[in-house]
């Protein structure tokens, strides 16, 4: 199924960090575990092969030992400018998994992230998500989750802001 008529979920945020630093903390596994997780979760596995055709496989553990696994498959990389990848839930071995709390969630999300210098010396970061080859039920699940995605990204970006400050102090 094509999702070309679907409005992507887009969020833009200015970070008070140079583009090179923001790129580094988003493309190196040793940085990602400091900030890339929902509130209350921590990273238990991070394996990064950051190149076109490569992937990032990660595991998170949250309250009561709940685990979530994910996989990013890199489609396009323009250093310090753009990353395009397919995002999916996975199992601990890197095979395709399903959203643990939303069984109708699309199997794959097409994600485009861009990085631009801001007038204030920071970085303007924009990320766009949309279902990739999803059925109507998956698209409806995605559309119904926009408020939650806004809240989730706000929390994750707050953690990223704090981490960037520690690196620059």
Enumerate the predicted regions with their spans.
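Short beta-edge strand/loop motif at the mouth of beta-sheet-based domains
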Residues: 10, 30-73, 168
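Glycine-rich, low-complexity intrinsically disordered segments
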Residues: 21-25, 94, 159
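Hydrophobic-ligand binding "helix-grip"
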Residues: 46-50, 57, 64-120, 162
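Hydrophobic ligand-binding cavity/cleft-lining segments
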Residues: 1-43
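Beta-strand/loop substructures that line and gate deep hydrophobic ligand-binding cavities in soluble
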Residues: 95-151
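Generic C-terminal helix-cap and adjacent flexible tail
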Residues: 162-169
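Hydrophobic pocket/interface hotspot
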Residues: 22, 32, 56, 74, ...
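Residue-level recognition of conserved beta-strand positions in structured domain cores
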Residues: 60, 87, 127-129
């Amino acid at each position: 199924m094509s999702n070309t008529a679907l409005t992507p979920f887009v969020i833009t945020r200015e970070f008070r960090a140079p583009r090179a630093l923001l790129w580094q903390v988003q493309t190196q596994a040793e940085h990602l575990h400091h900030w890339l997780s929902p509130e209350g979760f921590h990273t238990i596995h991070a394996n990064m092969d950051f190149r076109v055709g490569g992937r990032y496989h990660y595991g998170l553990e949250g309250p009561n030992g709940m685990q979530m696994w994910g996989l990013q498959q890199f489609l396009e990389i323009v250093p310090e400018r753009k990353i395009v990848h397919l995002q999916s839930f996975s199992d601990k071995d890197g095979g395709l998994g399903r959203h643990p709390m939303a069984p109708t969630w699309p199997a794959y999300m097409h994600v485009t992230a861009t990085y631009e210098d801001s007038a204030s010396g920071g970085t303007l970061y924009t990320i766009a998500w949309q279902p990739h080859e999803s059925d109507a039920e998956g698209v409806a699940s995605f559309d119904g989750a926009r408020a939650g995605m806004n809240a989730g990204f706000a929390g994750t970006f707050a953690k990223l802001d704090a981490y960037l400050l520690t690196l620059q102090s």
